């Protein structure tokens, strides 16, 4: 049997959204979840994993950098979160993680 072992730092941001207080979870759900389709969740998580680097994230997503910029601009227009800013990217990432953790099949 092969078991995967994760360190605290590897899973902290994945489980953190479940430990946010209820009003903050509701804010994330009502304000940001409405704008999170599967494509946008993948975009946000990939951008986050590349520390906001648009070129390398676009390469991993197999899209043109301008397409990624268009997606981030569209997301900004819908949520006022600028994914080029690390603090806004973190908020969007936490919302994406909470969405994945609470989504029912």
Regions found by a protein language model. Name each.
Residues 1-105:
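Cytosolic nucleotide-utilizing catalytic cores of signal-transduction proteins
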């Amino acid at each position: 049997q092969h078991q995967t072992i994760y360190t605290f730092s590897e899973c902290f941001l994945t489980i953190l959204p479940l430990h946010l207080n209820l009003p903050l979870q509701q804010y994330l759900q009502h304000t940001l979840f409405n704008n999170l389709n599967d494509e946008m969740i993948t975009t946000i998580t990939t951008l986050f994993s590349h520390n906001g680097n648009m070129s390398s994230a676009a390469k991993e997503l197999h899209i043109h950098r301008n397409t990624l910029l268009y997606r981030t601009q569209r997301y900004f227009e819908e949520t006022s979160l600028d994914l080029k800013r690390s603090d806004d990217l973190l908020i969007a990432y936490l919302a994406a993680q909470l969405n994945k953790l609470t989504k029912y099949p």
